[in-house]
Design a protein with these regions (language model features):
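Conserved hydrophobic beta-strands of the Rossmann-like cofactor-binding core
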Residues: 2-5, 57-58
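N-terminal Rossmann NAD(P)H-binding glycine-rich loop of SDR-like oxidoreductase domains
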Residues: 6-18
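Adenosine-cofactor binding site in Rossmann-like domains, unifying the SAM/SAH pocket
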Residues: 29-46, 70
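Conserved amphipathic alpha-helix within the SDR
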Residues: 42-52, 73-77
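Conserved NAD(P)H cofactor-binding loop of Rossmann-fold oxidoreductase domains
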Residues: 58-66, 91-92
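NAD(P)-cofactor binding segment of oxidoreductase domains
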Residues: 63-87
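Catalytic loop of short-chain dehydrogenase/reductase
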Residues: 80, 86-112
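Single conserved hydrophobic/aromatic residue that forms the stacking wall/gate
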Residues: 111-119
Length: 119
């Protein structure tokens, strides 16, 4: 399965990235620290490039502006109702201040989303 994750460099995004990699999936990560800014048109274009080859899009990158919402809208437009594609949209400021306790708890619940992703 081809999975693309924004905000993959730390926190929940990093844990999801590593988890899906460990399951043998092809996982691509996009983060501000690796040069992809969801708040810019160019950054979103880079993330959307080749999206037709992706099965699951994890919209996890945090944005002070409307970048995450704009990116979600653009992914929906590119996929144009393709029901074989899956979007996991993560939006919680609680994840911004993670620590060893709450990140482990969050990752332990990822199995709850897997049936949706793999359906």
């Amino acid at each position: 399965m081809n999975i693309r994750i924004t905000g993959h460099a730390r926190g929940l995004g990093r844990s999801l990235y590593e988890h899906f990699k460990s399951l043998g999936h092809n996982v691509e990560g996009y983060s501000l620290s690796t040069g992809y800014d969801i708040n810019t048109v160019e950054g979103r274009k880079q993330i959307l490039d080749g999206l037709d080859q992706v099965d699951v899009f994890v919209n996890n990158a945090w944005s002070e502006y409307s970048g995450q919402t704009k990116l979600l809208e653009e992914v929906i437009q590119v996929w144009d109702g393709n029901k074989d594609k899956k979007i996991l949209n993560i939006s919680s400021k609680a994840c911004y201040n993670y620590n060893d306790v709450n990140i482990d708890l969050a990752v332990s619940y990822t199995h709850l989303t897997l049936p949706t992703i793999y359906s």
